[in-house]
């Protein structure tokens, strides 16, 4: 049963389905306020008392502000744009989607340890927190999806699930060690966890040597802004927009445009229904570039123990 706080979302869904629902200005205003800031609809005694994470706020604000320098002519070049796109694929596609998510968080497939460590480096360069935070919080998200303990519970609004949850010291952070016992003792993981910024600085120095400040602005700051928001859309948009193919006991949706931006992560309802699956796009038209990459690694003999959902879930697959 849907939470009563999501009634405005139901209205919008019906509107998108060509229903004859008509909103007046006040209803529209109430809808958008509650859609983006759902906690405003909670009674005062139900609102969590959270402490702002000022370091995180400063970090994300700084990244976005420096990225604006890309609009200045002296920091633009097509080579710099190309470098940003290449690093977006490496850090967002290989690092986050293939590495942190499908390989490490869910163990949907296994690769040689040296290749897994490459995934960890690439994911660390995405600057979405250390590998322990990313994996631990993601595992919590699946265990408590769209309920109060979920770090980015979509009932609290689009803004909260997109970025707001990172702006506060949420209680879930204290449980990260409990959800990452399988990787906590790995020395390489520890190195990447403890040297997140230094690894990014090292990449910045390499980029500066290759192409000066345009490469740094585009390859670090602009690239991070895109990787950030495209990843965050998986937490926010795919719990609000799209269609449901499988029962998953939460609000996860399959959202085609998020899938295009995130190498197949947008087939989120499929993923929540079969969390262990290396393949998220289960229909022939649900393009999943990450699954294609896993199949390629399998052909090379590098990806093994690949987990897939039952055949009935992929009855119409290509």
From Swiss-Prot:
Q: Name one GO molecular function term.
A: oxidoreductase activity, acting on paired donors, with oxidation of a pair of donors resulting in the reduction of molecular oxygen to two molecules of water
Q: Which Pfam families match?
A: FA_desaturase
- In which residues does the motif Histidine box-1 occur? 101-106
Q: Where are the transmembrane segments?
A: 56-76, 80-100, 117-137, 201-221
One GO term describing the cellular component: plasma membrane-derived thylakoid membrane
Query: Per the entry, which co-factors are needed?
Result: Fe(2+)
- In what pathway does it function? Lipid metabolism; polyunsaturated fatty acid biosynthesis
Task: Tell me where the sequence motif Histidine box-3 sits in this chain.
Answer: 271-275
Reaction(s) this enzyme catalyzes, per UniProt: a 1-octadecanoyl 2-acyl-glycerolipid + 2 reduced [2Fe-2S]-[ferredoxin] + O2 + 2 H(+) = a 1-[(9Z)-octadecenoyl]-2-acyl-glycerolipid + 2 oxidized [2Fe-2S]-[ferredoxin] + 2 H2O
Q: What is its EC number?
A: 1.14.19.28
Where does the UniProt annotation locate this protein?
Cellular thylakoid membrane
Chain ranges for the short sequence motif Histidine box-2 as given in the UniProt record: 138-142
Which GO terms of type biological process are on file? Answer: unsaturated fatty acid biosynthetic process
Presence of keyword Oxidoreductase: yes
State the annotated membrane topology for this chain: Multi-pass membrane protein
Family according to the record: Belongs to the fatty acid desaturase type 2 family.
Entry text on domains: The histidine box domains are involved in binding the catalytic metal ions.
Question: What is the stated purpose of this protein?
Answer: Desaturase involved in fatty acid biosynthesis. Introduces a double bond at carbon 9 of stearoyl groups (18:0) attached to the sn-1 position of the glycerol moiety of membrane glycerolipids. Does not desaturate palmitic acid (16:0), palmitoleic acid (16:1) and cis-vaccenic acid (18:1).
Please give the name of this protein: sn-1 stearoyl-lipid 9-desaturase
What organism is the protein native to?
A: Synechocystis sp. (strain ATCC 27184 / PCC 6803 / Kazusa)
């Amino acid at each position: 049963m849907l939470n009563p706080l999501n009634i405005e979302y139901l209205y919008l869904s019906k509107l998108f389905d060509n229903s004859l629902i008509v909103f007046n200005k006040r209803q529209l205003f109430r809808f958008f306020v509650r859609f983006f800031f759902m906690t405003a609809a909670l009674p005062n005694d139900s609102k969590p008392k959270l402490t702002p994470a000022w370091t995180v706020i400063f970090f994300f604000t700084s990244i976005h502000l420096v990225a604006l320098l890309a609009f200045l002519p002296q920091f633009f070049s097509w080579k710099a744009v190309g470098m940003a796109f290449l690093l977006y694929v490496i850090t967002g596609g290989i690092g986050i989607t293939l590495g942190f998510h499908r390989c490490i968080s869910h163990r949907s497939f296994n690769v040689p340890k040296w290749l897994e460590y490459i995934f960890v480096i690439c994911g660390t360069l995405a600057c979405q927190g250390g590998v322990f935070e990313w994996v631990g919080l993601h595992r919590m998200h699946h265990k408590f999806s769209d309920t109060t303990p979920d770090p980015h519970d979509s009932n609290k609004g689009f803004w909260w699930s997109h970025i707001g949850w990172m702006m506060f010291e949420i209680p879930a952070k204290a449980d990260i060690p409990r959800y990452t016992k399988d990787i906590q003792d790995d020395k390489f993981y520890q190195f990447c966890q403890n040297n997140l910024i230094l690894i990014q600085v090292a990449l910045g120095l390499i980029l500066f040597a290759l192409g000066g400040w345009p490469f740094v602005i585009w390859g670090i700051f602009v690239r991070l802004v895109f990787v950030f928001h495209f990843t965050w859309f998986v937490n926010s948009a795919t719990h609000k927009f799209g269609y449901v193919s499988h029962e998953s006991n939460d609000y996860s949706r399959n959202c085609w445009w998020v899938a295009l931006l995130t190498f197949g992560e947008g087939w989120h309802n499929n993923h929540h229904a079969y969390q262990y699956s290396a393949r998220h796009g289960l229909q022939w038209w649900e393009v999943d570039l990450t699954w294609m990459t896993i199949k390629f690694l399998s052909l090379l003999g590098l990806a093994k123990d690949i987990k897939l959902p039952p055949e009935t879930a992929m009855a119409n697959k290509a």
